[in-house]
Each structure stands twice: as structure tokens, then as C-alpha cells.
Regions:
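Residue-identity detector for glycine
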Residues: 6-7, 11-12, 26-29
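Glycine-rich phosphate-binding loops of nucleotide-dependent enzymes
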Residues: 26-279
């Protein structure tokens, strides 16, 4: 079941239906959005138009859906709008057309702190840790909106990332790229999100560390978190994802299961050969 937690619903009843989701007021006034299982997506970007500068669009009608418990892979050539898509979903790039919904709620152009409250986590590609803070302090920063659950969530993260527990007092600035990626993922998971957005989690890592990152992503997904992952390592991404999308010039040009896309002659000819040369 998908869930997203945040503040109380102003003026709302304790329980009401939004499309396929039931919204309940949980403990400590948290907003709990529970998926009711009728086949609707937990996250949907529909006809998305977005860009950084006025009058210049990077996304030109992009469509992506993630259903509860899915791992979605987003691939495509450089400049296709992959990272922009995640940033637009997370409120970091202005959306000028289309919509983004989370469990039936319109979250288009919502601020990042509100999206964290609602159950969306985001791990950027760069500058994704606080280098002068320890590992544990980095994780604490991920739960600043709900500090009462700190001990519980730290225990959960150290179970999922044992190495972080062993080195919790070490400053993040001294970690390797793969270790920093683990810290960034764990911090995003501290709020127990229903959806996790990953922007090129294997970028800059050795092949061994890339494999570890993909396995860890699958493990996170197996806990019930829906994952939307942008990746330049296209072939590896398609091997582990449930469904995938190919972005080109700001639009979704192809979609299907990971295996379908990996075996699609057009995708192989137009994208996989080029992308394989980049990784």
C-alpha cells in the first residue's frame, strides 16, 4: 500500500476519499494517504511542460506514471530532460503546463518541504550530503519535520544500510562516492516516503559500486517504496526496473517493461547503443 504523511488536512474530515486513495488523520496529526488498490497510479506526471528560463521549455508534454510498489526507470540521451522531470515533480523547476498528482492529489508546483511532508523523497545527483556533518547528523537532517521518530527511523536506516551504522560518527565529507550516495538515500528515506525520486544514483561510481547501488535501490523498492530513477546506465537500469520510459527532447518517446524496452529494436538502435557508449 502506498502511503504519504504530512500535516493535517485543513477543514477536512478525519477520513475522505480522493480518487483511489483514502486520507486518514494518523498519529500526531499526520496526513496518511492509503492506496485502496483499484489500479490508479501513486504518482503521475501528465503532459508536463517545464523549464528553467522563461520561454524556454525543457519538458514538452512529458507523461510518466508510477504505480504502488513499482520501480520506474527513466533513460534517454543527454539533454532529453530526465533530471528536469524529477526536479519538476519535486517543485524545483517551474511547471508551465500539465500536472503532477500524488495519490490523486494535485501537487503541481508544490514546494519541496510540502512534498516531503506528503511522502515524496528526492536524492539529487550532486551536492547530496552535508560534508561537515557526521553520517548520523546527515540522517537527522532528513527527519527535521518529525523529530519524535528519530530513534525509530535511525534504527530502520542502519538495518537497511549497515555500514552507515558502523560509521555513524564519521564526517560525510570523508566518504567515497558510493558511501555518500548511501547517506543521501538514507536521509531521503528518513521520512518514510511512499515515493522516492533518484537522479542518476550510479553517476561517477565504479562498476562494482554501481552494482551495489542498483541492488540497494531494488532492496528499498522491495520495502514498498515506489521508486522513479533517472539513469544514464540505460542497460543496467532496464534490467532492474519494472517499467521504463525513454525521454527524448522533453517527451516520452517509448515506454514499456524494462525487458520490452531492452529488446525493442528501435530503442536499441536509437538509444541503447549511444547510451552504452556513455557509461
Amino acid at each position: 500500500a502506498a502511503r504519504c504523511e504530512g500535516g493535517t488536512e485543513a477543514g477536512g474530515s478525519e477520513s475522505r476519499e480522493i480518487d483511489s486513495c483514502k486520507i486518514d488523520t494518523g498519529q500526531e496529526g499526520q496526513l496518511m494517504v492509503v492506496y485502496t488498490g483499484d489500479g490508479a497510479p501513486v504518482l503521475e506526471a501528465k503532459d508536463l511542460v517545464a523549464g528553467y528560463l522563461p520561454g524556454i521549455n525543457i519538458l514538452n508534454g512529458c507523461n510518466v506514471r508510477a504505480y504502488p510498489g513499482e520501480l520506474i526507470g527513466i533513460i534517454g540521451p543527454n539533454g532529453a530532460g530526465k533530471s528536469t522531470l524529477l526536479k519538476a515533480i519535486f517543485g524545483l523547476v517551474p511547471v508551465r503546463g500539465g500536472s503532477v498528482t500524488l495519490a490523486g492529489q494535485d501537487i503541481t508546483n508544490s514546494k519541496a518541504n510540502r512534498l516531503v511532508q506528503l511522502g515524496v523523497g528526492f536524492v539529487p545527483q550532486n551536492n547530496n550530503v552535508f560534508p561537515t556533518l557526521t553520517i548520523e547528523e546527515n540522517l537527522q537532517m532528513g527527519l527535521y519535520l518529525r523529530p519524535r521518530l528519530l530513534a525509530q527511523r535511525l534504527a530502520a536506516m542502519y538495518e537497511l544500510f549497515p555500514v552507515l551504522g558502523e560509521r555513524r560518527s564519521q564526517r560525510a565529507g570523508g566518504l567515497s562516492g558510493g558511501e555518500r550516495q548511501s547517506v543521501a538515500m538514507a536521509r531521503a528515506l528518513m521520512m518514510d516516503p511512499s515515493v522516492l525520486l533518484l537522479d542518476e544514483p550510479s553517476a561517477g561510481l565504479s562498476p562494482v559500486r554501481q552494482d551495489e547501488t542498483f541492488l540497494r535501490t531494488r532492496r528499498i523498492n522491495a520495502t514498498g517504496v515506489s521508486v522513479v530513477m533517472v539513469e544514464q546506465n540505460a542497460r543496467r537500469c532496464l534490467q532492474i526496473c519494472d517499467r521504463g520510459y525513454v525521454l527524448d527532447q522533453g517527451r516520452d518517446s517509448h515506454s514499456g517493461t524494462g525487458h520490452e524496452l531492452a529488446d525493442d529494436p528501435k530503442v536499441i538502435e536509437l538509444y541503447l547503443g549511444t547510451l552504452a557508449d556513455e557509461v
